[in-house]
Amino acid sequence: MVVASAPGKCILFGEHAVVYGEPAVAVAIDQRVTISIKTHQKPGATWKLEGVPFIAEKHPHLEGLRKRLWHLSEQTPSLDIAINSKLPSAAGLGSSAALSVAFSAALRAARGRRVDEKGWCEGFSSELKTDPYNEPRRGHEAGFIRNGGRRLLGKDAIDEDECAILAHAIEAEVQKGRASPIDSSTVSHGGCTLLSDDFEKGLDWRYSRQLSTPEGKRNWEVHDVPVPQDDVWLVIGNTGKYSPTGKMVERVASMLAAEPERMNEIITIGSIARRGADALKKGNMEAVGICMTENHLLLRGLGVSSPELENLVKAAANYSLGVKLTGSGGGGCMITLTREPKQTAEAIELAGGRSIVTSLGTSGVRIDDDENVPFWTPGVADS
């Protein structure tokens, strides 16, 4: 059996502004999606999900990863798959990215990874020319397979970068060519991530991402933001109201088209995101909280808050260093930075929300069990 897990995430700064090239900052949270896979004896490389036959059309994230990592053939073992999620779905907490990252890690651990003494490595990476967005299969591995080479198995085969780039490719595929890499990068690497269209001074650059979208080619620079050791918590308040991200993004786009002078508010949100990242780096959590509240006021001015969100924001404010909606708005969740997590969670619950308490910047993807790997040895046709 292989067991892999990945955390959810929440956006600290930069919602909506990131669509227009401004930076956004996200942190990994304690709540995780866990995936277990094991082989079963039914022939024909079939998959079962939660004990029933796998239907690709109903699970596009899993199917996209199957195409890239587990090509079905008579030699490929059949799998039983189980999913355990501590993240609410469609709440802006990165549940789909966590699912993709955890599943990519589980499949990689189960099949292993070939490497050689010259530094060649099977798989997908920001440093390789391979394209997980458009090239699910890797034919040029044939020579290496014939010539031998060392093989990494289980947790030793896992690469956070590969998990992140595969998850972004799957998100783009499912969302018809539109997907930011902030969710996939944050839940794969853990910690805190800043995404921008440009290199940001004073932060460690991680890698670049490119994506061909219906609107043209997009480029992002992904940075690591240090998270200080401090007795401070995030409390997430879930309104229970679902609001499609696309609808809220379109609302802001329509407003900016009608009132182009309001682009100044978008630029200001970007400035707040940079100040917030700098405050995190310096360990000034009071300043982080101030930036969060300022960000919320601007998002509210853009019309993406809701009565339900405002009710929870108001309830939590007295116990918070900072408070804001997180994600696209219109519903979903709000977050508060606090040194009093119990009182804050109780205030959110009394106001009608569902509370989640988490630390900031938890660990990213990991393998929790890798017994009896590899499940099979891919041949040339399976790679």
Question: Where on the chain are the PLM-derived regions?
Answer:
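C-terminal nucleotide
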Residues: 1-7, 11-13, 18-19, 26, ...
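Residues at or immediately flanking beta-strands
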Residues: 78-80
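Low-complexity, intrinsically disordered segments with a bias for serine/threonine
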Residues: 128-130
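Hydrophobic alpha-helical membrane-insertion segments
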Residues: 134-136
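Glycine/serine-rich anion-binding loops at beta->alpha junctions
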Residues: 5, 84-107, 180-181, 321-338
